[in-house]
């Protein structure tokens, strides 16, 4: 099996990249692809860049040229579930755009024209993530809806909009729905596994920039455990 792994920022992929053997690097269309092995599993690690367009471009190249069997989106996310704290893990059951609105044409809020309202994560990959979590002592995780938009959600107004329109949301970030939609169009199974870098409505002693390396470490550990179970 070949596993595609996608992170937006250098900080989100560095730990995984450093664990790769026989690593080959290709730069294309503003994206960086690292192909090799992690724990004897064939992987292609993509550093896509931030935001939905960058993620869609990178995922398209990944799926078309490298043809992984499955895709794991890793990195950081902002927590919306009240039980989440910094460093906790979120696992997607489904992914939606929170900044898409073509309701004037009869679509649901968050649904892009011609696309499903939600992109369902692969059941086997979700179960794999749960099994990986069992091997991570003292790591709290929540499984549910992750919402994506081309904005860092930091205002009370935007948080309220998301909560009102997507009441089951557990986390938000800036790439997953683009990755999910691209995987949907390529019929490639996906799951999103991210670590919480900040939490809505909770004061944190650490800023996003300060906590990002720790979130990257936590999400990378999840991916390592999943790759061990894939073999």
Swiss-Prot record:
It catalyses: S-adenosyl-L-homocysteine + H2O = S-(5-deoxy-D-ribos-5-yl)-L-homocysteine + adenine; S-methyl-5'-thioadenosine + H2O = 5-(methylsulfanyl)-D-ribose + adenine; 5'-deoxyadenosine + H2O = 5-deoxy-D-ribose + adenine. Pathway: Amino-acid biosynthesis; L-methionine biosynthesis via salvage pathway; S-methyl-5-thio-alpha-D-ribose 1-phosphate from S-methyl-5'-thioadenosine (hydrolase route): step 1/2. Substrate binds at residues 78, 153, 174-175. Its EC number is 3.2.2.9. Keywords: Amino-acid biosynthesis, Hydrolase, Methionine biosynthesis. One of its GO terms (molecular function) is methylthioadenosine nucleosidase activity. The active site is at 12 (proton acceptor), 198 (proton donor). Disulfide bonds: none annotated. InterPro entries: MTA_SAH_Nsdase, Nucleoside_phosphorylase_d, Nucleoside_phosphorylase_sf. Pfam families: PNP_UDP_1 (PF01048). One of its GO terms (cellular component) is cytosol. One of its GO terms (biological process) is L-methionine salvage from methylthioadenosine. The keyword Methyltransferase does not apply. It comes from the Bacteria. Catalyzes the irreversible cleavage of the glycosidic bond in both 5'-methylthioadenosine (MTA) and S-adenosylhomocysteine (SAH/AdoHcy) to adenine and the corresponding thioribose, 5'-methylthioribose and S-ribosylhomocysteine, respectively. Also cleaves 5'-deoxyadenosine, a toxic by-product of radical S-adenosylmethionine (SAM) enzymes, into 5-deoxyribose and adenine. Belongs to the PNP/UDP phosphorylase family. MtnN subfamily. This is 5'-methylthioadenosine/S-adenosylhomocysteine nucleosidase.
